[in-house]
């Protein structure tokens, strides 16, 4: 590995470990499968218990509204669209003990701080409902100010689906084709796909390791053919979500030391950032 990329990765880990929740959760590596490198995707079988799944669904019932999509990249305003036909709602962060534990488990598994995550979104798909392929990263200025790009997405399946409802990655690139029998929907055969199974969680990254957006992360929710689908989504940003970065600050106590060592020039993506994603040491690098 090139030394500058190794150092950037090490700096990232330092930042992450300094912010992760103290909640104790043992990640079971025997339940985790790496599905793909393009995009980087992982499946954690049995991440949520049946009780956790049922509780999240119960919190959402009676509060669901038609799902929306972003319509204006400048304002971030949303609109109704046939691209996305599910219904959903957002919980509040740490709404109760179970929600707080789920959020802490997500931080422990992903090694990404709790504060970087949006509130959990609960989604319900009935017969024929779907979400066409889309990206979870974005370029609207309002969203970027609230935490930068969504570095990762975690989809947690809260119910089993008789048929359909798979998560599909149309731009997936792999050496070995994924074999699919008649139990898979036609939509799922358009790329690499994951069947929704109650309790399982799918983690995939929307950005490359160097911080640039990954077009291979294009994904969609296939139409439900039989049954219904419940899921919970956790979008995780590159920095604390909801705090506008309008002041010139460093996001790590070692920024000045790294800047003095020349890291502003050696690792500009991490230290300074780009037009669409702010770096972590802009003040020390005199970028603002």
Curated annotation (Swiss-Prot):
Its recorded name reads: Probable prolyl 4-hydroxylase 6
Give residue ranges on the Cytoplasmic side.
1-4
* Family statement: Belongs to the P4HA family.
Instruction: Identify the SMART domains for this entry.
Output: P4Hc, ShKT
Q: Which gene encodes it?
A: P4H6
Q: Which residues cross the membrane?
A: 5-27
| Entry membrane topology | Single-pass type II membrane protein
- List the carbohydrate attachment sites: 160, 210
Keyword Glycosyltransferase listed: no
Positions of disulphide bridges: 248-288, 255-281, 264-285
List the Pfam families: 2OG-FeII_Oxy_3
Q: Which InterPro entries match?
A: Oxoglu/Fe-dep_dioxygenase_dom, P4HA-like, Pro_4_hyd_alph, Pro_4_hyd_alph_FE2OG_OXY, ShKT_dom
